[in-house]
Amino acid sequence: MKEIFLQISNRQDLSQDQVQAVFDRILKNEVSESQIASFLMGLKIKGETSDEITGIVRALKSHATVLPETFTDAMCNCGTGGDQSYSFNISTTACFVLAAGGIRMAKAGNRSISSKSGSADVLEVLGINVAASPEILSKALDEVGLAFIFAQTMHPAMRFIGPARQALGIPTIMNLVGPLANPLDLETQLMGLYRVELQEIVANTIQQLGRKRAVIITGPDNMDEAALYGTNTYTLLEDGHISQHTFTYEDLGMEKVELSDITGGDAKENAEILLSVLRNEASPYLETTVLNVGLGFFANGKAGTIKEGVELARQLIADGSALEKLRKLQEVQV
């Protein structure tokens, strides 16, 4: 590790092979917690590159648990977290609506690292087994069209990184890697990103990983979700081309919702918010959800525009389809 630390301290980027070799050692528990923390902090200070992110993703996928069935049409809408917005679990709520729209959702997630409640914490309150076996996950993806992919189950060696991440308590390259290291080879992706300046780097990584189409979204104040105030910036990967765009709530004909209106709470409180949205109860939470679902339908290609996606999201919530997806997942992912 000494040579690696020297290179990082000189602000020299690492190659994919170098990073993959380091993470192979980390995932075999051959690197101390203090060294892992130093490595993550060093990359953050230096600035992460596409090659470094890809190297970690490759290492994680090579150590990941494999599902017994192969799915080639799946999507994930997991974000990086780490935006310090303390909003409710937007992408977790949105995934049920996206699944109701006919998209096979392999929703990755974890327990809370830097917020009150991670997606795993909320789903656990709702009776979903976040530590379900690969066989059950395959069944859920097949029968429900939706499964929650718990990082600690599919990436058991991640337990060697967790303590260092918890000790640092700030976003690191692992926040970027998490949504990209889905054990399934995703066809499409919506990824929330807490730093707008990293969008192009992440888009290049996603392209290297073979995604057909993807959107990387950063909301106002560097939220890792789209929001109904200020300007949202997204990078679109489509047909091998990468382009950046912006939009506001006004562009979509929607009402303004301040960040303070979508604050979440602990896992139990966020589970109640999720249920209220899927029951179509009018609120800022509902409006923010349909915005992000609309963006998800656009990212997948199911909607030609974000506005069309928002309209589809409203229909799927209003007719109970999204709530039914939750009920079915509660029956299968147990």
From Swiss-Prot:
Superkingdom in the source lineage = Bacteria
Tell me the residue numbers annotated for binding anthranilate 1.
79, 110
The UniProt record gives the binding positions of anthranilate 2 as: 165
Which coenzyme or cofactor does it need?
Mg(2+)
InterPro entries reported in the protein's UniProt record: Anthranilate_Pribosyl_Tfrase, Glycosyl_Trfase_fam3, Glycosyl_Trfase_fam3_N_dom, Glycosyl_Trfase_fam3_N_dom_sf, Nuc_phospho_transferase
Q: Which parts of the sequence bind Mg(2+) 2?
A: 224-225
What remark does the entry make about the cofactor? Answer: Binds 2 magnesium ions per monomer.
Q: What is this protein called?
A: Anthranilate phosphoribosyltransferase
Give the originating organism. Answer: Streptococcus thermophilus (strain CNRZ 1066)
